Amino acid sequence: ETYTGTSTTEKTVTFSGLSNLHPWSAEDPYLYTVVVSQKDENEAEEMAFSTKYGFKTVTISGTKLLVNGKRIFVKGVNTQDTHPEYGRAIDMETMLKDIKMMKKANVNTIRTSHYPRQPKMYAMMDAFGMYCVNEANVECHYNQNLASNSSWQTAITDREVRMVKRDRNHPSVLFWSLGNECGAASDFSSAKTEMKKYDSRPIFYCNEDNNVSYSDLHSNMYPTVYPTSDNKGVSSKSSGANGKPYFICEYAHAMGQAVGNLKEYWDVIENSTGIIGGCIWDWVDQSVYDPAKLVKGQKKSDNGFNYWVSGYDYNSTSGVNQGFQGNFLNNGIVTPDRTWTGKLSEVKKVYQYVKFSDFSASAKSVKIANKYAFMPISSDNFEIGYRVMKDGYLVENGKVDNFTTIAAGSPATVILPIQTSVDDKAEYLVNVELRVKKPTKANVADWTSWAEEGYSIADAQFSLSEQDISNGTAKGTDGTMGFPVLPSYTSTGGSLSVSGNTVSGTDNNGKKYSISFSNGKMMSWTYDGKKLIAAGPDFNSYRDVDNDRWISSSYSSSSSISVTSSLRESGSKATMSVKGSATGCSYTTDYTFYPDGTVDMKVTFSPSQSLARIGLGMQFASGFENVEFYARGPRSNYSDRKTGSYLGRFTTTVDDMVDELIHPQTFGDHEDLRELILTNKTEGVQLGVKVGGRASFSLSHYDETQWCKGTDKMWQTKLHWYDLTRNSQVYAHFDYMQRGLGNNSCGGDQTLSDYVCPSWGSYTYTLRFKPQSAESVNIVAE
């Protein structure tokens, strides 16, 4: 297109010759190269510039948000310009890392809370495919109301219009945000009028359930999933609100150990007719390195923890709010240095664009529903792969060579060419994965530039077992494999004897063992002369995470124990039963000791009130550093945050199981435990634990009393991981159930009823311990 003229005034140019445009979307970020040059009357070029540009439409149809005529969901996060070393001066490398991590986690939207970003970031969002809720620098915070003061009207309008003028040519901008927490904000009416003169995209304001004319979307912050006495809940807006699409501008407050029940939010959202999605608060913890240490080049302590500081490091007067709000700046789903967390694993799973369901173990078939708005699932851009595991060990890794293209918004059934034969002696699981492929066709944008070839962008796990491993939970359902059943045990050789409160013997390898009790409590356990425990099992209901702030919780980790059936030989075995009584729960433990050194510990819990956790704590002896576990992993997961964590066999160390959340708190849970193997490589001894029934576990070198702060609830208590004392013994939890995390550190759900520990009934698991020599064991941390 060529235009001529001599006018120096503003001129509008219409490109009438463009047709058959390839539209831009976050799924297919196709960009054109636009070259603009200025020539003189002799056709000599005076100046020129080149830019990337994408074409898309954004419209509202009733209560739906449409991009290029198709309904899309906002799978978003709120972001901040923050860097642990540079503070608010975020560099390009970190911005790029953020965008790539978000794409890998199926995040498709960034809300620039609460100010526009530097232009480089919009170019990245255009190129990699990320929708942007572009927010003006108008933030009053919480109970402030400057935007209703007419004296601020001109300044506010100026900020809004400058944002639109600067960023209107970026296809990534989905809609505009007038600002944040400015009250009724009457000044926004005139601002919206001026903004619409320059761009037609929707305009939004976080109007806290108020039906305001200057917002094209309805919005509020931190709703619960379902209605409560003081919160209308997301489900109440399934059809939109006030005739507008409903957008959750902030939800799932991710402070500390968090992001519970995200799946339930999205079950409601994706089944709605008027909810467009939401943005998690927020992307990254905003702590920085301790400046005093940073100037000396010190970023990590001797025990390997980062020298991160938080709001309470800048409060000089205890209990006085000086604007720093304790730990309240650390609400990220990644850490300050952008480390992937268990929280992000959950987000990736819940946000994924593919649903796997209706798996048939006999037919080896699975239904795949394509939830992309535009992108087909075809052999040009994806590979459908699978991995078969036997008791957690990989036994087959394959792919589907030919499959029919699955159109956007459509389902199809796919046959997996699984070759593994299953039997009734093991648990067989299959992980089905959708893996990205680099495009090879011309005129196709490289939508995978953020990922390596073969990256699994969506997945699910199903049971292949013929064995009934379930105790009532339906097997073969995505993410719910049921709980393991321990077969009856027969000792293979060995001998034992009982003397008073001690059972001792020799196993089938000639190794001696001894277990002693006092008043029903295990006091010592040795194998081949080596200590296995530092403290025996006892009831423990204590937990402390940011989302528990609404609970006043003192430390509770002991019970009164009495012997109900004394230690005695019974045939070739020995048995003993004890009863324990603790606040809110009584329990019984039935011990069975086998000649080969195996010990069964069958525990039945009878709670009388709803607790944070129902389970036992114990301490393993120093040296048991190497860990292999068959449970959900590899990262920590909880009862309402395990959708993105699959059963598998993982190796690590106790030290590496720490979740380095900024403020120390309960960490490291792994749900649906089948087997745990602890190895002391120094002394050549190994202790295996197999599980029957429901159980989760965690391991730590840190005594949790170090972060038990009673009623302070982590707002002002100054505490860091590098302040804690690392003990040599291993603190272990074996829980029948731990309360779900919820997301109540700032509004939202405390814990949904499905994830609350029961306050009545009886609940049983069995732990089967087996010590053995480990001279040849060589477990490597991964």
Task: List each model region and its residues.
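Repeat-solenoid scaffold signature
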Residues: A184-D187, A254-I275, N402-Q467
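An acidic-aromatic substrate-binding cleft motif
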Residues: H22, L31, E45-T109, H114-R117, ...
